[in-house]
């Protein structure tokens, strides 16, 4: 696990951009993408660059259940706004939040991941150590699945909605086994509220109670964190 500590999220975005550029320069064709406030500075750096993804495929981590793709709170809408409108990919895959048969949608998305092995997957980390929507206690061997979101995750996402009651209670998510199949993982974390999760992920035991700790077992992980998120690490990086 390569750990890079930067001053703030803006600097983290520049480091994240370097990881994307290096992957593209080395022939990466499939990029696993994430949403939320964490990757936006990396996406901004990409948008303002001359990187070309027109021959590449994107596969997103997750999507809320019950939200239409054109809803401004959907992850499809987020990706269009923050990346795809400026940097289109040859093809882009996200779970279908309005799928009438969730079980069939899970199988479809597993097939997408199998047919498009991910070269670089970007991740954030929740305050409880979740990655994607894989909450504490999620089985390590799980692939795409429907998740009942925890109260802490609903609360954390409420800032994006008119009220906490509007936050969806379920989501489709790549599983931990799906994520671990990626060739290279890039995890970003910014802010003091991520410090406990970051410490557990890097220095704590590998435990299902902190899903991100599974990354200790992956052969190629880059972690980009700001000084606040790194504040509880006992070792200097």
Swiss-Prot record:
Protein name (Swiss-Prot/TrEMBL): Glucosamine-6-phosphate deaminase
Pathway: Amino-sugar metabolism; N-acetylneuraminate degradation; D-fructose 6-phosphate from N-acetylneuraminate: step 5/5
Cellular component, GO annotation: cytoplasm
Protein function: Catalyzes the reversible isomerization-deamination of glucosamine 6-phosphate (GlcN6P) to form fructose 6-phosphate (Fru6P) and ammonium ion.
Annotated GO biological process: carbohydrate metabolic process; glucosamine catabolic process; N-acetylglucosamine catabolic process; N-acetylneuraminate catabolic process
Classification via Pfam families: Glucosamine_iso
Example GO molecular function: identical protein binding
Record's keyword terms, sorted: Carbohydrate metabolism, Hydrolase
Protein's UniProt keywords contain Hydrolase: yes
EC class of the enzyme, as a word: hydrolase
Organism for this UniProt entry: Lactiplantibacillus plantarum (strain ATCC BAA-793 / NCIMB 8826 / WCFS1)
Catalytic residue positions: 62, 128, 130, 135
Catalysed transformations (reactions): alpha-D-glucosamine 6-phosphate + H2O = beta-D-fructose 6-phosphate + NH4(+)
Family listed: Belongs to the glucosamine/galactosamine-6-phosphate isomerase family. NagB subfamily.
EC number: 3.5.99.6
Keyword Iron: no
Family matches, as SUPFAM superfamilies: NagB/RpiA/CoA transferase-like (SSF100950)
